[in-house]
Curated annotation (Swiss-Prot):
Mg(2+) binds at residues 489, 491, 493. This is DNA-directed RNA polymerase subunit beta'. It is found in: Plastid, Chloroplast. Its EC number is 2.7.7.6. It comes from Brachypodium distachyon. Its cofactor is Mg(2+); Zn(2+). Binds 1 Mg(2+) ion per subunit.
């Protein structure tokens, strides 16, 4: 039905009992109205046909076979008469069997039942509207206590109780037998309310506009009081103010959506279409059924028992009726949410029943798995890995995924460039992986963005556009800076890749969804492309250095190699294993690293530009060395100053590692590139 009417959204909310009936009711030509499920049976054990008025009734939900009724008759071709839409014998409609996927039924409850989502949810909507504690409402719903119903302004037995305490105490011997007489039932129904019916009465008496006005007045009074200095009282006042705001918002929402508060208490229980809760027969007379069918059976049995007791109310004890009402409430709670009463309900094999909430919610629920997570054409899926050589707006696609996604475009270009004569030969060239295929594939990918998505897509940065490039292997390569927007890491996460086909979709991807255009969080405005997880660990390892300090070279007895010397001479740079090497440029240090003479965390001395901050520092040198020609070396914790005999500074050497040098070069190149780009814009 969603495809038929082209609905763009789906919303879950409250509906009226009249709407539930309209979903299910069908009028037969003889005037009979069908739609109510009254029996807990499913299929007849001999004929394997659905039971009448049961959970799989063909009269209520439609035929199992298209155009064939329960009698085996079929509708005459071309018959458009209204009377011929239904079988005159069994009452089954001659319709397509797919109607059993959306035709609903209903159960008429013998007593009102609260909807567990609105009673026990956080926050409790019923408790918020009634401004009563949830514990008291639960006790009222499950029959733990009752309250006096203000049904009339005349004096009643319960109202006069406080005026005649002494007289009542003296008449206890005559009052007690009254509760066991049939007259007590009339008295109870008139003056005492309990169960979900009491909640429904209170909700029906609410005036939402008055609730908003009174809550606003109380909130202003609390705001004018200010702080009292008592921490406990101030905390209670803050909690009350938050509650009043939430109550006003809830009442306003009910008014705007034209929803009545008493609809949170059910009088009619909808029954799902049978195709959404199937029964499957397997070999060996084994039957596999949905748990929802068993939960519906429990509701119908208990509801029928309660209806029977209410018909014989003059013979049934009041306590038995209240107990049966509680059982109906618990059965409906289990159907809607199995774990609402603490421990979930289990079957005879100690297996937890899967309720409607369990079917809907979670990663394997109806929405995320079936509706949002279903497979579509022109899409693929694979594990993500780091792509160190990629730009921020690029992603690496494996050859297998790329050729599958862009196969139609490659075939079109092969035929256009007269490399093949028809589609069949083009597919064979692709299957044989000829070189021209990869050339055309790269040309096609150069002008076509792709979309990467990681479930769950909780905000708009969960799906972004990238420029694809071909990579070896079977994994999708990704720049690590975009991981925070996806909430992804490289420990086995998978991502889906989609191909935008229309020109509008490609334009939207380029203008709005490219990763280098989504650098800030849309929620709070903070940078979203920041180093996280793997990048932070890599930067830490790159810049960790040698924690043993400058004195490790002199006093380290196990780290020196006095008998092994390796010289590295390049532009007056000297490296020996028995002391920390000295380099006159970062290029020399990188050359030594490529020749495996030093490692990333090996301490070294690097000649640096004259820095006035280092020269003017008040740090005391660790050691000062003088040479015969008058030159001297002032050794500090992280740098070395070389001066001449005239006390002039000739050069400065900093003590660093190759990891620090590489990190500094990357930052310097990035800053220079940004400065050049900024100067061009000016």
């Amino acid at each position: 039905m969603i495809d038929q009417y082209k609905h763009q959204q789906l919303q879950i909310g409250l509906v009226s009992p009249q709407q539930i009936k309209a979903w299910a009711n069908k009028n037969l030509p003889n005037g009979e109205v069908i739609g109510q499920v009254t029996r807990p049976s499913t299929f007849h054990y001999k004929t394997d046909k659905p039971e009448k008025d049961g959970l799989f009734c063909e009269r209520i939900f439609g035929p199992i076979k298209s155009g064939i009724c329960a009698c085996g008759n079929s509708r005459a071709s071309g018959a458009e008469n209204e009377d011929e839409r239904f079988c005159q014998k069994c009452g089954v409609e001659f319709a397509d069997s797919r109607i059993r996927r959306y035709q609903m039924g209903y159960i008429k409850l013998a007593c009102p039942v609260t909807h567990v989502w609105y009673l026990k949810g956080l926050p409790s909507y019923i408790a918020n509207l009634l401004d009563k504690p949830l514990k008291k409402l639960e006790g009222l719903v499950y029959g733990d206590f009752s309250f006096a119903r203000p049904s009339t302004k005349k004096p009643t037995f319960l109202r006069l109780r406080g005026l005649f305490e002494e007289e009542i105490a003296s008449c206890n011997h005559s009052i007690s037998p009254f509760f066991s007489t049939p007259s007590f039932t009339t008295f109870r129904n008139r003056e005492i309310a309990t169960g979900a019916g009491a909640i429904r009465e209170q909700l029906a008496d609410l005036d939402l506009q008055i609730i908003i006005e009174n809550s606003l007045v109380e909130w202003k009074e609390l705001e004018d009081e200010g702080y009292s200095g008592d921490e406990w009282e101030d905390r209670k006042r803050r909690i009350r103010k938050v509650f009043l705001i939430r109550r006003m918002q809830l009442a306003k929402h009910f008014i705007q959506t034209n929803v009545e508060p008493e609809w949170m208490v059910l009088c009619l229980l909808p029954v799902l279409p049978p195709e959404l809760r199937p029964i499957v027969y397997r070999s060996g007379d084994k039957v596999v059924t949905s748990d929802i069918n068993e939960l519906y059976k429990r509701v119908i049995r208990r509801n029928n028992n309660l209806a029977y007791l209410l018909k014989r109310s003059e013979l049934a004890p009041a306590d038995l009726v209240m107990c049966q009402e509680k059982l109906v409430q618990e059965a409906v709670d289990t159907l809607l949410d199995s774990g609402s009463r603490g421990q979930p309900t289990r079957d005879g094999h100690n297996k937890v029943y899967k309720s409607l909430s369990d079917v809907i919610e979670g990663k394997e629920g109806r929405f995320r798995e079936t509706l949002l997570g279903k497979r579509v054409d022109y899409s693929g899926r694979s594990v993500i890995v780091v792509g160190p050589s990629l730009s921020l707006h690029q992603c690496g696609l494996p050859l297998e995924i790329a050729i599958k996604l862009f196969q139609l475009f490659v075939i079109r270009d092969l035929i256009t460039k007269r490399a093949t004569s028809n589609v069949r030969i083009a597919k064979r060239k692709i299957w044989e992986k000829e070189p021209i295929v990869w050339e055309i594939l790269q040309e096609v990918m150069r002008g076509h963005p792709v979309l990467l998505n990681r479930a769950p897509t909780l905000h708009r940065l969960g799906i972004q556009a990238f420029q694809p490039t071909l990579v070896e292997g079977r994994t999708i390569s990704l720049h690590p800076l975009v991981c925070k927007g996806f909430n992804a890491d490289f420990d086995g996460d998978q991502m889906a890749v989609h191909l935008p086909l229309s020109l509008e979709a490609q334009a939207e991807a380029r203008l709005l969804m490219f990763s280098h255009m989504n650098l800030l969080s849309p929620a709070i405005g903070d940078p979203i492309c920041v180093p996280t997880q793997d990048m932070l660990i890599g930067l830490y390892v790159l810049t960790i250095g040698n924690p043993r300090g400058i004195c490790a070279n002199r006093y380290n007895s196990c780290g020196n190699y006095p008998n092994q010397k390796v010289n590295y001479n390049n532009n007056n740079s000297t490296y020996t294993r028995d002391k920390e090497p000295i380099f006159y440029s970062s290029y020399d240090a990188l050359g030594a690293y490529r020749q495996k003479l030093i490692s990333l965390d090996s301490p070294l001395w690097l000649r640096w530009k004259l820095d006035q901050r280092a020269i003017g520092s008040r740090e005391v040198p660790i050691e000062v060395q003088y040479e015969s020609l008058g030159t001297y070396h002032e050794i500090y914790a992280h740098y070395l100053i070389v001066g001449n005999r005239k006390k002039e500074i000739c050069s400065i050497y900093i003590r660093t590692t190759l990891g620090h040098i590489s990190f500094y070069r990357e930052i310097e190149e990035a800053v220079q590139g940004f400065s050049q780009a900024y100067s061009y814009t000016i």
